[in-house]
A protein has these predicted regions:
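Selective transmembrane-helix segments that form parts of the transport pathway or gating/packing helices
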Residues: 1-3, 75-84, 495-513
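Membrane-anchoring hydrophobic segments
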Residues: 1-83
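Short helix-loop junctions at transmembrane helix boundaries
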Residues: 2-32, 92-108, 114-117, 504, ...
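Alpha-helical transmembrane segments, especially those used as permease/efflux helices
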Residues: 37-41, 72-202, 515, 537-556
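Alpha-helical membrane-protein architecture signal
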Residues: 156-164, 168, 178, 439-445, ...
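Basic-flanked hydrophobic alpha-helices used for secretion and membrane insertion
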Residues: 205-459
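A hydrophobic alpha-helix feature that marks transmembrane segments and, especially
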Residues: 455-479
Length: 563
């Protein structure tokens, strides 16, 4: 089985990483010996634990066959009821903070200027959920079962009444381990879901940075076309987008600032609306924008998915010395690799008429889409003939009033001078194939490890509950048989087993999934991405795993009772 599963997981790893390898089935004596050694070591450790247990436990306790319910401990005192209510309150506080994390940060930091809240509020959410989990199984759930078994206006009898009391007795013995299993399951789902969400986020971000097969500076576009023709790689689509670099004054407000806005003077790349529409033909995922007047603009920021939680822009922006625009929306960057542009992340889309009126330094980036999958031979040819390097230096300096910019193309700043000049460079080429291959292989390794660990945790926790129920059923099978002698039918006893196991599996499963879902929602409050649907999918998979564990437990428990 170990060899078969090893083969299975190696195939998953090769597929996830996109490797061009063949996984052969072979017999590994070293793996067999290592597995045998691990089993022997585990048996030795288990034997030592059993010996210590027998040595420390009195003989009278070992040979005792009857089991007495902890009736005194099962009593619901006012204090336990109060602690049960407190557990539900803590659970609600944790869930509420996870839903309103961004607003809580903003309001608290605005009034206190305590930026440590960025750290301790998520830790407070974690503390509330963990504490509430233990209180839930120690006090809240037993209190609920107690009140369900004490009806006032209706009569509860038969299987449900017995099931409620059996579950209360079970929780009294195992509430600590049950709470721990729930927390471990929630953490496993959260980490796996969070990992897969981050992988999806990274993949989508990389796909957004490299929307086409190649991005190349206008100066090297001809050389790239020649190399692609030599390699028999046809170009299916191409767009050359001009950018105009100039200065922009924008008013921003950071999280927690008491003042209205901070004025920032930065460099920006301008793009005409018609050029943006041409780019959208190659990048269909880019949002559609409409500028009704020549005084409206849309800002694209490569860090917007992260900074949107901490920075807000004011509507009015000023480009150059005298051109004012109204910022109608802010979006993520869909213009490809920002390293191919001067002034890096910011791109401002404006009407064509306004674009022509503004002065600045103009340069071009060509976006090429190819049909064939890039081969290693083409990759090596590009590395030799058209290496990726920082080139095209552009030196610029602001005027004394910070309203105008003077440019010095193809000139690097003299490092010995203190003239206030700044030199910017840009990359010559961006290759989608090599970058996406590296991202996929890295994501494949992380995905393989996270899924392997997560599946092991789910199987271990569900198996632990199954084994505990087997032990509990074996100990109480004579009580079940006694019920048949007291007049309960076979269907009523089976209903009791179904109903009791529902209360064993359902609360922990629902609570673990709720913890995981709200934890994932906390992640979305920090970094927004559509990739978190994978995390919710894995939470559904966990629910299915526990459903199968429940069905297996019920069937085997019935077999133990009825044989």
């Amino acid at each position: 089985m170990g060899i078969i599963f090893s083969k299975f997981f190696s195939m998953i790893l090769i597929r996830a990483m996109g490797l061009n390898l063949t996984s052969h089935f072979f017999n590994s004596p070293q793996s067999i010996f290592s597995t045998v050694f691990v089993f022997i070591a585990a048996m030795i450790i288990l034997s030592i634990q059993v010996i210590l247990f027998v040595w420390r436990t009195p003989m009278s306790e070992l040979i005792k066959t009857e089991y007495r319910l902890p009736i005194k401990k099962m009593k619901m005192t006012p204090f336990r009821t109060l602690m049960g209510v407190l557990g539900l309150i803590l659970l609600g506080v944790g869930y509420y903070l996870s839903l309103t994390l961004r607003e809580t940060w903003t309001n608290y930091i605005t009034y206190t200027q305590d930026f440590s809240a960025i750290l301790w509020i998520p830790l407070l959410i974690l503390f509330c959920c963990i504490t509430a989990t233990y209180l839930f199984f120690d006090c809240s759930l037993p209190a609920l079962l107690y009140f369900l078994s004490k009806p006032k206006k209706r009569l509860i009898k038969g299987a449900k009444l017995i099931a409620y009391n059996n579950v209360r007795a079970y929780l009294q013995r195992t509430w600590k381990s049950y709470a721990l299993l729930t927390i471990i399951t929630a953490i496993a789902i959260s980490l796996i879901g969070g990992t897969m969400g981050v992988i999806s986020l990274n993949y989508q971000a990389t796909n957004r940075i490299y929307p086409t097969s190649f991005q190349v500076s206008g100066e090297q576009a001809g050389a790239l076309r020649t190399l692609l023709e030599k390699s028999d790689v046809p170009i299916t689509a191409e767009q050359a987008i001009p950018y105009k670099m100039t200065n922009m004054t924008v008013q921003t407000r950071y999280l927690g600032e008491l003042q209205d806005e901070s004025v920032e003077n930065m460099m920006v790349n301008l793009v005409a609306l018609s050029d943006y529409q041409r780019l959208r033909k190659l990048v269909p995922g880019a949002p559609e924008i409409r500028l009704s007047t020549d005084k409206q603009a849309v800002l694209f920021d490569s860090q917007y998915d992260v900074t949107r939680s901490f920075i807000t822009y004011r509507d009015e922006v000023k480009v150059g010395s005298q051109h004012n625009f109204k910022l109608i929306q802010a979006e993520q960057d869909y213009f490809g690799d920002s390293a191919l542009r001067y002034s890096l992340p910011n791109v401002l889309v404006i009407q064509d008429e306004a674009y022509q009126q503004i002065k600045g330094f103009t340069y071009t980036i060509a976006y090429l889409q190819t049909e064939k999958v890039q081969t290693d031979a083409l990759t090596q040819l590009l590395d030799e003939e058209l290496p990726i390097e920082w080139a095209h230096p552009l030196t610029y300096e602001f005027s004394d009033d910070q309203k105008n910019v003077r440019f010095y193309p193809e000139t690097a700043r003299d490092s010995s001078s203190d003239s206030g000049q700044t030199t910017a460079y840009r990359l010559t080429l961006a290759n989608r194939f090599t970058t996406m291959r590296g991202v996929r292989r890295q994501a494949g390794i992380i995905l393989f490890v996270s899924l392997f660990v997560g599946v092991i945790v789910l199987i271990t926790t569900s198996s632990s509950l199954i084994v505990r129920q087997f032990s509990n059923t074996e100990r109480e099978k004579y009580n079940y048989r006694l019920l048949t002698k007291l007049g309960y039918t076979r269907n009523e006893v089976r209903k009791l087993v179904y109903w009791q196991n529902i209360w064993i599996f359902m609360p922990g499963t629902l609570l673990a999934i709720l913890h995981a879902v709200f934890a994932i929602n906390t992640f979305t409050q920090i970094i927004d991405s559509p990739g978190y649907w994978v995390a919710h999918l894995f939470a559904a998979v966990a629910a299915v795993v526990y459903l199968f564990a429940y069905l297996i437990t019920v069937k085997l428990c019935l077999r133990i009772i009825e044989t």
